[in-house]
Amino acid sequence: MKKIWIVAAATNLAFSLSAQDSGVETQAIGVVIDAHAIVDVVDDEIVFDFSADDPAEAGDPFVLGSNKNQTTYLNYSLMLSNGGIDDGMISVRINDMNEGMHMTLLADSSPLASHDANQYGTLGTVAANFDAKIGASPVILNSTDQVLIENIGSSYTGNGAGNGYLLSFTAHINDYSKLDADNGAQDMGTITYTIAE
């Protein structure tokens, strides 16, 4: 029995001597971050209600009142998958706009002015043709995607009203002969925002 104990102790000592730590140790680490691209507008629906804008006198036209101007905020979160090239973008298009009307859009990045790049990342710039800060003329939306925000790196705008890009829409009459009343129901169109890299 004594021999077995001595053999076991010697074996244990041999293993513990070979497994001793050295003065330097390395350890592998892994970090997993999924690429993501999420875009949102604060208001799921913008209603241009012109029911109070009927002409008061015979012979007067129907004229769009103050409700022709509406605003909302565009928010996004983007994690690039391409090694840090700031090539993300958000495009915009409109479908099923009321006949006889069109919609224009301007975007303003002023709400992002205080966002620190170390915290929020590389925020995108408003495409020059949409940029309200440089005095661009409002862009007519159509069914073709148009680049609204460009040069987006891995970043996020913050969520909700007051965060992101201020979008200013204006409704216009472009063909009075095609206008028709909706009798209290609203005609529905769709504005689509697409974020991609």
What are these regions (language model features)?
Residues Q20-K133, P138, D145-E197:
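N-terminal small/polar-rich segments of proteins
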